[in-house]
A protein has these predicted regions:
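Glycine-rich NAD(P) Rossmann-fold beta1-alpha1 loop
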Residues: 121-122, 144-151, 212-216
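Glycine-rich beta-strand-centered segment in the early N-terminal region that forms part
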Residues: 15-32, 44-89
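NAD(P)H dinucleotide-binding glycine-rich loop of Rossmann-like/cofactor-binding domains
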Residues: 39, 70-72, 81-144
Length: 242
């Protein structure tokens, strides 16, 4: 799938990828939709050099072929169900992927569910628990609660025993994400984010880890309510740089 001059997705016939020795050919069953895909559609996020020029960063599917190096250095086999992180090209019937960029589809997950593991879920896990060192009993602030990343990061943090504060733009959005399990949902149309974070800090819940995909004024408003030694992780600047 490619984009025309009007930024619409169009079907296009392309040749099947030819795998390199260290690559695996995967027949695609499902693909994730990420912010990067939307930006690429607008011409603001070019694919890495050497990657297909059509969209798609994460997929799930079934291995159809292995290069000789991939076969020798891995335990992957034809027919294995996998999900993969790509430089691009996931919106296609087949993709070529390095063997070490694959993960097995966990038992119990559908292909559609597995397609969000390599980029969306992995980003949330990496930033909360590896970069941010979030632990059970600590507080995570995850603004933009209805975003793709936050909708995964919130239940992920809760599953590991953390307390979660998030923010949204309206009461309707707050209701729509209530099932994610956040302890505090800030409706920024009615409440000031900094005021709520200050109240939480005074109640004994300073922010240990913030996973921020907004940027803009969010950092200045909220940084004073971080605990000493806390982690503020900026993933994106959707609300601007300053």
């Amino acid at each position: 799938m490619l984009t025309d001059e009007n930024k619409n997705l169009i079907w296009s016939e392309v040749a099947d990828p030819v795998i390199k020795p260290d690559e695996v050919l995967v027949e695609v069953h499902a693909a994730g939709v990420n912010r990067a895909d939307l930006l690429q559609r607008e011409g603001k996020y070019p694919s890495p050099e050497g990657s297909p020029q059509w969209m798609g960063l994460e997929i799930s599917g079934v291995i159809a072929e292995l290069g000789p190096e991939a076969k020798a250095k891995s335990s992957w086999q034809v027919g294995d169900k996998v999900c993969a992180l790509l430089g691009g090209g996931g919106y296609a019937e087949k993709v070529a992927v390095r063997y070490d960029m694959l993960m097995p589809v966990p038992k119990g997950l559908t292909m559609e569910e597995a397609a969000i593991l390599p980029e969306a879920l992995a980003t949330s896990y990496l930033n909360l628990f590896i970069e941010g060192r979030l632990e059970a009993g600590q507080t995570a602030f995850i603004p933009a609660g209805a975003s793709g990343l936050a909708s995964l990061a919130i239940p992920l943090a809760k599953a590991f025993g953390a307390r979660v504060i998030t923010s949204v733009l309206s009461e309707d959005i707050a209701k729509s994400i209530s099932h994610l399990g956040a302890d505090v949902i800030i409706d920024s149309s009615k409440e000031n984010t900094a005021d709520v974070l200050e109240q939480q800090m005074k109640a004994g819940f300073p922010v240990n880890v913030a996973m921020d995909c907004l940027g803009g004024e969010m950092l200045g408003q909220s940084l004073p309510f971080m605990t000493n030694g806390g982690y503020w992780i900026i993933i994106s600047t959707l609300a601007g740089v300053t």
